[in-house]
UniProtKB/Swiss-Prot annotation:
Pfam families (alphabetical): TPR_12 (PF13424)
Family: Belongs to the kinesin light chain family.
TPR repeats: 192-225, 235-268, 277-310, 319-353, 359-392, 401-434, 444-477, 485-518, 527-560, 569-602
Chain's gene name: KLCR3
Protein name: Protein KINESIN LIGHT CHAIN-RELATED 3
Amino acid sequence: MEGGSVNESHSNADQMFDTTIEELCKNLCELQSSNQSPSRQSFGSYGDESKIDSDLQHLALGEMRDIDILEDEGDEDEVAKPEEFDVKSNSSNLDLEVMPRDMEKQTGKKNVTKSNVGVGGMRKKKVGGTKLQNGNEEPSSENVELARFLLNQARNLVSSGDSTHKALELTHRAAKLFEASAENGKPCLEWIMCLHVTAAVHCKLKEYNEAIPVLQRSVEIPVVEEGEEHALAKFAGLMQLGDTYAMVGQLESSISCYTEGLNIQKKVLGENDPRVGETCRYLAEALVQALRFDEAQQVCETALSIHRESGLPGSIAEAADRRLMGLICETKGDHENALEHLVLASMAMAANGQESEVAFVDTSIGDSYLSLSRFDEAICAYQKSLTALKTAKGENHPAVGSVYIRLADLYNRTGKVREAKSYCENALRIYESHNLEISPEEIASGLTDISVICESMNEVEQAITLLQKALKIYADSPGQKIMIAGIEAQMGVLYYMMGKYMESYNTFKSAISKLRATGKKQSTFFGIALNQMGLACIQLDAIEEAVELFEEAKCILEQECGPYHPETLGLYSNLAGAYDAIGRLDDAIKLLGHVVGVREEKLGTANPVTEDEKRRLAQLLKEAGNVTGRKAKSLKTLIDSDLTSSSALR
């Protein structure tokens, strides 16, 4: 996949969670709401490279504004109760309007103001609560007021940095009080939002696994049939839960949450609301991160169709969607369509005053030109982007390093090795500068990209050294199992190329175990990794294990790529060789016969690869007629040598 990024770069995670917690507390406790408050910045936020451009970094939670809560109204015995809760998830754009103002008169509904996700209105109430006939105060009212007070204290502790653990304890106590105050188990919106706050504090403490059950509980409480308020409260919880799953690398669970949230949003706002389009883009980004590109393209097309329906062509939101679509098309090899979308995105951003961000799209445009072998145009696009980024971001910005890497790749492809090495050195200088503005993930991504160029220049040991550094960085980051698995798989190929077959086997084994744990057992990447591990087994004379790996890879690649794809054909050739080695001649002949037939049709009979496999097939047929006279032969003649490179794993 293209090197580069997700979204905006959020380097200070602690500050991010501080503002997230404050925003969630505001949802509960502040009277005023505003539909101008910034939401979590999605792919189209710009400001740095796109989600895909950073080699599928994990979904980061977005920035939220600072707020004040529980303001005194001048009367000690009164507190402002929320007229509406701005139920904004820390993850997605929840700029949802429950009811337009012109509908208020028709429905007779009062106290419904325009907000991002307005989920309910309440009036001021005396702190003492309601008096019962016996003169005692209603306990549930006291519980609610105490819970709000505890949330205020928790917010202050988080803001001051005094004790986040104490803040967590207070939010748990507040949640229990809200739960106890719920009438006859009836869902309480304040309770739901308190759980959202509690989960956000857990995330600030990097206790993601503890946050997940809290958020799961928060999405179980709302009853969608109760109305828009409950539906949108559930939407907020689902999006926050999806983000938390992403932080621990559970992308499939994350996508399920986003999808369910999107369906709720559609039900409330309608299929063609522009805000639904923004959530579509968010889901598409997650699908890209999970390497589910076909689904990501479909969701992104839905977002673009919403822009067409809204009659707002060339908007910033459409530019974001086209940028994402361009990168999806580029990843799928549809370079012409990718170029079209990226050029339109660049024009739209320039028209909307986003000149500083055009540089990032110019980088992607250069990628498309490079893929189309239009090298002169690619150089122009990269140089234009490089000049703009140096001016806007500075000489040592990671985005500048990213363009250096692309230029190094371009010059290496065109045989200008000296220029390629020079640009690699410039990029390394940036990533090894210990610049605090560069996040660890950006450094790891940059080192990984440089290693690919080093490998192509036959500097294999240097490539492994860079990958080891990247691996060490990612090992300390949550939710990076897929990235770590990808690096390990690439290292496995390099070890194989160096003849270090045991090291290759061990790194592939580690990579595959991580891919299984993250649910990536049905991806093309997983199938290719299995095939490569099988090759390492062949070299270690572990033929039976190699057969098992090849057969598993066969099932995956047939489903994901089809029986005529080059990757599948190479796997067939390897499996045929392994079958031959263990005496399963009929199976070997059947597979190799299919490979030869397809190769002749696609490549012609004079192609060297076709000729080699025809000779192998002829030998197998000869041996099948005289099994007792079989001669031992090296396993190296049984495998497809074309698949012993790492290109397929990038």
